Curated annotation (Swiss-Prot):
Induction: Transcript is detected only in the apical cells of hyphae, suggesting that HGC1 is transcribed in the apical cell. Induced during hyphal formation and upon exposure to host serum. Expression is regulated by the cAMP/PKA pathway, EFG1, FLO8, SSN6, RAD52, TUP1, and UME6. Repressed by farnesol and linalool. Residues 754-764 have a biased composition (Gly residues). This is Hypha-specific G1 cyclin-related protein 1. Gene3D superfamilies: Cyclin-like. The keyword Cell division applies. Residues 1-42, 408-433, 447-679, 750-774 are annotated as: Disordered. Interacts with CDC28. Belongs to the cyclin family. It holds the Pfam family Cyclin_N.
Length: 785
């Protein structure tokens, strides 16, 4: 039996020289472990791997494989086709959707960075996971366990130059024969720096910890899942990965890397061009790694041949940097030349290229932070500038670090089908792309399989949903769109903007406004999506509004009725231009009375047709503020029968009768003049469509005044009180009966202060515009839905 406690091999010459130079290395590891001060005083320096030896090894390797290169290539292609995931079977997963898959991939990327996994091990792990998902049903509670186990398997299969000793087995193998991490700073056999990067395999307790306590995984579950995954894949893990076709050996060489002084630079010459070439080679490596990782996020590329994917990545790099075959950094597949090109169908080529571009444009925040170097940032910006998206160059330039950029941006709606694989020139008044680097961390981590519309929201509202469509470009991030509108006198300068953010245009030309809570809007800031509507008169009799006649949207958008800003002075700003909103109150009241008399004679058919067309958006309402709007029509009377109302008010105390008397008193003040106007225009039906729609908006909104009289019904019939369907159905009857005062006549006559109400008098007339009720968000939402 071999005595493993003795040294297996004699010390090499370099070890003897190093021991002579550093005599303190003779100290035993046992003493160093017992004496932490002695171990802390040691200093170990890794030797650089000889570059001459590296070049010689590469030369001999190429000569050995030159005779069998075609056979090896055929075997690799066969393995790729055999171990390719099946997308049709992947789509039959009952629980694992593509959205969940993308979240799992994002989680695995974070874990690989946390564990300092070597490059492209993450790519191999995702491919193993896709193969497993093509053969087994994945439960959601086991999804993290499966994909983490795939990372563990991939790190074992292609872990690279791993010479670290498992510290848990030191007692069995003899700790005196090996230099461990504790006393050397690097693993056994790691005395050389290079030629490739070394790393430590992830331990099970680290995987359990990184998955989180909520998952409740243990080390035994990882071991069982590892065997289960290997049995499912039939232990076939030797299929090549993408780095074997797009990465050269010298790009894996860490000796010449100058990445933030992480490794010492071995270039001793003072030639700056040599340093630049070394840095450029590292940047091209990062670009290929970035494009490969981004392609994993596209479900369209799950079953794509990795050789074809690598060819598309190489072509994208050559197109972006305009590299020619005679250039030093020209990218090819497996050293192929014009005699043996990679050939495949052009339609599939365009499909792969389009999917890769979409994946890059939808890169998450975390990925852009990982690939923060100049190369990936540059190619990301070039993709935004070159390929045809539905935004102009001015919108991109205006979004970069310019708080006062021009607001005349065009439509920023971007769809996934509008990406052309033909690059367009980025000439014109554009900023240098190098100045854009540093703004790439503003991407959303959200991925979905459907096309979305880039909508402007509050700057503090993160978009957490997932999307595989082309999202807002880097220069059009939401926090770059906010403008200061505290000075409302400059409103006319911004009203000509043609931004269509916050709107969703459906196929039937119906336009909806994206709901934004009014409480999230700053008191000194207006979102551009709330200002740049195309207003139109539509034959309205209200001439107090000044409209800007510059159409900017293809769909005619009705003007919102109300909007509020929470100013300390309680001065409310209308959505309409402030020139009309700040008119004298006396003039507006007189105009309102004229509008009220005209609107009251509208027919039932006109009112019902426009009920749902111009409802204000939820973000245009306030929670507890009063409005004195010239566009408001008094609300309809209460829909309860006089007999029920009389019985309810008889059971109530004096505190419930007093508000009703105030309500009656206000109506008595305005009753006479209003009824005389009603009688003068009773036969007139010539009312404009915009006026009738204003009736439907104001009449369909329930008010807080109803709560004052119906508090006893909140327990049993609260749904009836706030029901929008019954209010819409019964408003036509109320509008006709309100003119004659027949609906509320019994209630008013029995509860008025002087008891002089009559059936045709002014006692049943609704309140005037100056006594506008409170608009609540809850009731409006109930009406809309």
């Amino acid at each position: 039996m071999i005595n493993i406690t003795k040294p297996l091999t004699p010390k090499s010459i370099s070890q003897q020289k190093q021991q002579q130079q550093h005599p303190y290395k003779n100290i035993s590891t046992t003493k160093s472990n017992n004496n932490p001060q002695a171990s802390g005083s040691k200093s170990f320096v890794q030797e650089k791997y000889p570059s001459q030896l590296y070049e010689s090894e590469i030369k001999i390797h190429n000569q050995s494989l030159a005779e069998y290169d075609l056979d090896i290539y055929d075997i690799m292609v066969n393995l790729i086709e055999t171990n390719k995931p099946n997308l049709s079977l992947y789509k039959q997963q009952p629980y694992l959707t593509f959205t969940i898959r993308l979240k799992l991939i994002d989680f695995l990327l974070k874990m690989s960075i946390r564990l300092k996994i070597l490059p492209f091990v993450f790519f191999k792990a995702v491919k193993i996971f896709d193969r497993y998902c093509s053969k087994r049903i994945v439960l959601l509670d086991q999804s993290q366990l499966i994909i983490t186990t795939c990372l563990w398997i991939a790190s074992k299969v292609m872990g690279g130059n791993n010479h670290f000793v498992n510290i848990n087995n030191l007692d069995k193998i003899g700790h005196e024969n090996f230099r461990t991490i504790n006393d050397l700073g690097y693993g056994c056999g790691g005395k050389y720096l290079g030629p490739t990067e070394r790393f430590r395999l992830p331990k099970l307790h680290e995987l359990v910890k990184l998955c989180g306590a909520k998952c409740k995984y243990d080390q035994g579950m990882f071991k069982q899942m590892e065997v289960h995954v290997l049995n499912t894949l039939e232990w076939s893990l030797n299929d090549p990965s993408i780095e074997e076709f797009i990465i050269d050996s010298h790009e894996f060489n860490v000796i010449n890397i100058n990445n933030n002084n992480e490794y010492e630079q071995t270039i001793t010459t003072n030639d700056e061009s040599a340093n630049a070439n070394a840095n450029d080679g590292n940047e091209f490596f990062k670009i290929k790694e970035f494009l490969s990782y981004a392609a994993l996020y596209s479900h369209d590329l799950i079953d794509t041949n990795i050789i074809e994917l690598g060819q598309v990545i190489m072509d994208l790099i050559n197109e972006t940097f305009q590299l020619q075959p005679f250039d030093k950094h020209y990218q090819t597949i497996l050293n192929c030349d014009s005699d043996h090109p990679i050939r495949f169908d052009m339609q599939r080529y365009k499909h792969i290229k389009k999917a890769v571009i979409k994946s890059v444009l939808n890169a998450s925040d975390f990925m852009m932070k990982v690939f923060h170097s100049k190369g990936p940032q540059f190619i990301y910006q070039q993709f935004n500038l070159q390929y045809k998206l539905n935004y102009t160059t001015n919108s991109i330039i205006g979004g970069f670090g310019n708080s006062g950029y021009s607001p005349t941006t065009t439509t920023t709606t971007t769809t996934s089908d509008n990406i052309s694989t033909t690059p367009t020139s980025s000439t014109g008044s554009t900023t240098p792309v190098s100045s854009y680097i540093g703004y790439a961390n503003s991407r959303s981590s959200s991925v979905s399989s459907t096309s979305s519309v880039a909508s402007s929201s509050n700057a503090n509202t993160p978009s957490s949903s997932c999307s595989t469509t082309s999202t807002t470009p880097l220069g059009m991030t939401p926090h770059k769109r906010q403008k200061n509108y505290s000075n409302y006198s400059n409103y006319s300068n911004y009203s000509n903007s043609s931004t269509s953010l916050g709107l969703t245009n459906n196929n039937n030309n119906n336009t909806t406004i994206s709901p934004v809570d009014s409480t999230t809007i700053n008191s000194h800031t207006k979102n551009s999506s709330q200002l740049n509507y195309q207003y139109h008169n539509g034959g309205s009799n209200n001439n107090n509004h000044h409209h800007h006649h510059k159409p900017s949207l293809s769909v005619s958008i009705p003007p919102p009725q109300m909007h509020s800003h929470h100013h300390s002075s309680t001065v409310y700003q209308m959505v309409t231009p402030p020139n009309s909103a700040n008119k004298n109150s006396n003039k507006s009241n007189s105009a309102n009375n004229n509008n009220t008399t005209t609107i009251a004679t509208t027919t039932t058919t006109t009112t019902n047709n426009n009920n749902n067309s111009q409802l204000p958006a939820p973000h245009q309402l306030s929670y507890n503020n009063y409005f004195n709007s010239p566009n408001m029509q008094p609300p309809p009377p209460m829909k309860y029968t006089p007999g029920r109302k009389q019985q309810q008010q008889q059971n109530q105390g004096q505190n419930q009768q007093q508000p009703l008397q105030l309500y009656q008193g206000d109506n008595n003040n305005n009753g006479t003049n209003t009824n005389s106007k009603f009688n003068s225009i009773a036969g007139s039906r010539a009312v404009s469509s915009s006026s009738s729609s204003a009736v439907s908006i104001a009449s369909s909104i329930s008010t807080n005044n109803y709560d004052k009289y119906d508090d006893d019904d909140d327990d049993d019939n609260s749904n009836d009180l706030f029901s929008s369907s019954r209010r819409f159905m019964n408003y036509s009857n109320y509008s006709s009966s309100t003119i004659n005062g027949s609906v509320m006549s019994g209630v008013i006559n029995n509860n008025s202060g002087n008891g002089k109400g009559n059936g045709n008098g002014g006692s049943g007339t609704p309140i005037s515009e100056n006594d506008s009720p409170i608009y609540t968000k809850t009731r409006l939402c109930n009406m809309i839905h």
